[in-house]
């Protein structure tokens, strides 16, 4: 029963995860965010009433 022998597939699994973890994170972390968060004031804006034309 070759599936019970962990030598070939376990080495391939570990090596593939090692490659993924060394290649993918620098690519993902290399992206820059275009919209930097800005601080907003805590005061609520007072809405102005609309002047509806009642024709």
UniProtKB/Swiss-Prot annotation:
Keywords: ATP synthesis, CF(0), Hydrogen ion transport, Ion transport, Membrane, Mitochondrion, Transmembrane, Transmembrane helix, Transport. Subunit 8, of the mitochondrial membrane ATP synthase complex (F(1)F(0) ATP synthase or Complex V) that produces ATP from ADP in the presence of a proton gradient across the membrane which is generated by electron transport complexes of the respiratory chain. ATP synthase complex consist of a soluble F(1) head domain - the catalytic core - and a membrane F(1) domain - the membrane proton channel. These two domains are linked by a central stalk rotating inside the F(1) region and a stationary peripheral stalk. The lineage of its organism: Eukaryota, Metazoa, Chordata, Craniata, Vertebrata. This is ATP synthase F(0) complex subunit 8. It is a single-pass membrane protein. GO terms for cellular component: mitochondrial membrane; proton-transporting ATP synthase complex. It is found in: Mitochondrion membrane. PANTHER family: ATP SYNTHASE PROTEIN 8.
